[in-house]
A protein has these predicted regions:
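N-terminal nicking endonuclease/strand-transfer module with a His-rich metal-binding environment
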Residues: 1-167
Length: 167
């Protein structure tokens, strides 16, 4: 999360601080946290969100810590024909329809192209919580997916992104 947002975040579990504030190969054009309507106010803070997600995973997944997954990472190409604001709204609609309406929090960052790369490479990075979030915090239960089901969801998200972008 710190790397994607080019921020400085502290991991409460390890005590380590990750500082990517000076990383500038790809500028962050937009950064935001999207949460379900009934999420607690602290969930809008990137550090609080991911530290809580890690705590929930440790607390509710004691048997399989070594295979615990806190978030799903998704990279998405955006359209260079659109303005930054149009791309942000497009991304926001997709996030709302696919994730926050279903109880998941999303950490979204829009990056510009590399200085020396293709200047049309405007893209977004999404970190989606694996547990739903409500006023009490993260759910003790999370959806378990095998490779086949995850592949089906990825195909669903691709189709949903195509429909949202076409709209």
């Amino acid at each position: 999360a710190a790397y994607r947002a080019r921020e400085r975040l502290r991991d409460d579990t390890t005590g380590q601080t990750k500082d990517y504030t000076r990383k500038a190969e790809q500028p962050v054009l937009f950064s935001g946290i999207y949460t379900p309507k009934n999420a607690p106010a602290w969930a809008k803070d990137r550090g609080a969100l991911w530290n809580a997600a890690e705590r929930a995973e440790d607390e509710h997944n004691r048997k399989s810590r070594r295979v615990a997954i806190t978030a799903q990472d998704m990279d998405m190409a955006l359209m260079d024909e659109l303005t930054l604001e149009q791309n942000r709204r497009l991304l926001q609609d997709f996030i709302r329809e696919q994730f926050t309406r279903h109880g998941y929090a999303v950490d979204a960052n829009i990056h510009g192209p590399d200085r020396d790369g293709d200047q049309r490479n405007i893209h977004a990075h999404l970190l989606i919580t694996m547990r739903t979030l409500n006023v009490q915090g993260f759910s003790p239960v999370k959806r378990q997916m095998d490779r086949k089901e995850l592949s089906q969801w990825v195909n669903h998200w691709r189709e949903a992104w195509a429909k949202t972008a076409s709209r």
